[in-house]
């Protein structure tokens, strides 16, 4: 009797295991998108596994002379240089450009830049590109992705060797808030369709800005944020976070590290893809509830960076406002806004 029962038990065990395996094969693909909210269009798109370009490790530094780091020597900057989560805060005096050049140039990296010029903002394209050609990632391969509703308005700007400009037509919108809200979605789709095969790092910047001094590989990192020039010296309770709890971008008074600017973010293309997807999903969640965050995508960007800390933070010298006098703590301005009539631009 024992042997038949043992055989019967073994048969039931094998049958149950086979059934579970078949059930798993049937539902595993469904599980990949089961967490996507019902209101999102094309949930499969947001779960794409992209074959990103292979990560390139830094090369050993050989036969290069540079000053010895001295822990006890007074630093050349008055700014904080390290966040509480051990991410570097980059500013003039915190890095050696020649040392970084020797480490990064052998990697043959391609750095992408997305910029949007819709409506009257096309008037800023020429100055932006000319300043980028003079100062942005000199000596590296650069691919500008210019999104515009009017490709005929893009001026011809001479580009250096290894530097490309792709003009990508997009729909125009009458309200500037709608343009801002659509940017995360557009960048995310562009990475999925194209940029993940073409660039190693991607920066997303505003077109009404100009480069004023060299911008190099010191800015490269997994996920990079820039401190907003208007709020780097004020307590976080005064940050213009979204304070309504009904919004996905809600931030409590006791939360937050820095207030980051929406005019600049970047990082490894895979991380930027994940970041823009998360922000776009949060924007859609608000839209489903008829809510628009206080500062649109910038509010969602700041909410995301509280939960998911940036691996590198850029000081306000990388995102300055020309209307403000430069404080003594900033030794240099690298990227700043241009003077403009905001009311005219938004009409």
Swiss-Prot record:
Q: What class of enzyme is it?
A: transferase
Q: Which residues bind Mn(2+)?
A: 206, 208
Q: Which coenzymes or cofactors are required?
A: Mn(2+)
Q: Which reaction does it catalyse?
A: a globoside Gb4Cer (d18:1(4E)) + UDP-N-acetyl-alpha-D-galactosamine = a globoside Forssman (d18:1(4E)) + UDP + H(+); a globoside Gb4Cer + UDP-N-acetyl-alpha-D-galactosamine = a globoside IV3GalNAc-Gb4Cer + UDP + H(+)
Enumerate the InterPro entries for this protein.
Answer: Glyco_trans_6 (IPR005076), Nucleotide-diphossugar_trans (IPR029044)
Name the pathway. Answer: Protein modification; protein glycosylation
Keyword terms: Glycoprotein, Glycosyltransferase, Golgi apparatus, Manganese, Membrane, Metal-binding, Signal-anchor, Transferase, Transmembrane, Transmembrane helix
Q: What Gene Ontology biological process does one annotation of this record name?
A: carbohydrate metabolic process
Q: Sites of glycosylation?
A: 108
The residues on the Lumenal side of the membrane are 28-347
Q: Name one Pfam family in it.
A: Glyco_transf_6
Q: Name one GO molecular function term.
A: metal ion binding
Give the note describing cofactor binding and stoichiometry: Binds 1 Mn(2+) ion per subunit.
Residues the record lists as binding substrate: 116-121, 206-208, 228-231
Q: Name the predominant localization.
A: Golgi
**GO CC, any one term:** membrane
Q: What EC number(s) does the entry state?
A: 2.4.1.88
Membrane topology (UniProt): Single-pass type II membrane protein
SUPFAM superfamilies under this entry? Nucleotide-diphospho-sugar transferases (SSF53448)
Superkingdom of this protein's organism: Eukaryota
- According to its UniProt record, where is this protein located? Golgi apparatus membrane
Q: Where are the transmembrane segments?
A: 7-27
State the family named in the UniProt similarity comment for this chain: Belongs to the glycosyltransferase 6 family.
Q: What is known of its domains?
A: The conserved DXD motif is involved in cofactor binding. The manganese ion interacts with the beta-phosphate group of UDP and may also have a role in catalysis.
Name it: Globoside alpha-1,3-N-acetylgalactosaminyltransferase 1
Q: Can you name the source organism?
A: Mus musculus
